Amino acid sequence: MILEINNITKRYKKGSEEFTALDGVSLRIEKGDYLAVAGASGAGKSTLLNAIGGLIHPDSGEVLYNGKDIYNQKSVVTDEYRKKHIGFMFQQFHLMPYLTVIENVKLACYEKRHIDNIYSYLERCSLTGMKNKYPYELSVGEKQRAAFIRAIISAPDLLLADEPTGNLDPGNSAALMSLVEEYHIKGGTVVLVSHDPLSVKYATRRITMAKGRIVL
């Protein structure tokens, strides 16, 4: 077992009002799972990914990685969990604006073999000619593909992807999801949020969220 989420709750305030983004969510993610998370906007899907990824501290409950609560450890442990075990593709991409595409990708490379694979990923994602461009010089789709390569380049234990093909044409969507499936076949674990049928067709498990809860 790779990850266990036990009864996590997360609330936010909007002005004077409080709303619940996650309401007692529990979930087991086994090594080698390919989990697709569905649900309407505001259902809690992205908040769940952020909690799994070590980015937001739940108000209650626990997120266990190999038996250790990632939020009940020293911050350095949480940082190592995020850097060494998680590949995260955000909807907002979060590319460093002062770094080129290839420099952004290298931020996620911890071994020489990861760096050696960069050009193959750039070619398969049609970004070879953009490798020395800065984020402001890229289209939204090109930024998305660069963010994807950064997330997957180190073959992390767990790939978290939030709408990974949302800004891509069918050809680039297919190329990206082919790389995700190859990663999964080699033993990687995937948690993916998407409304795109192509993105979820390889999923081995599916859940649906509504109002911060898993309903199906």
Give, region by region, the residue ranges found by the protein language model.
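Hydrophobic anchor residue at the start of the ABC signature
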Residues: 148
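Conserved signature/switch motifs of ABC ATPase nucleotide-binding domains
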Residues: 133-136, 154, 186
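ABC ATPase NBD coupling module
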Residues: 70-87, 185
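Catalytic Walker B motif of ABC-type/P-loop ATPase nucleotide-binding domains
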Residues: 159-162
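Conserved ABC transporter NBD signature motif
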Residues: 61-72
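Conserved ABC ATPase signature
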Residues: 134-144
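Helix-to-loop junction immediately C-terminal to a conserved catalytic motif
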Residues: 53
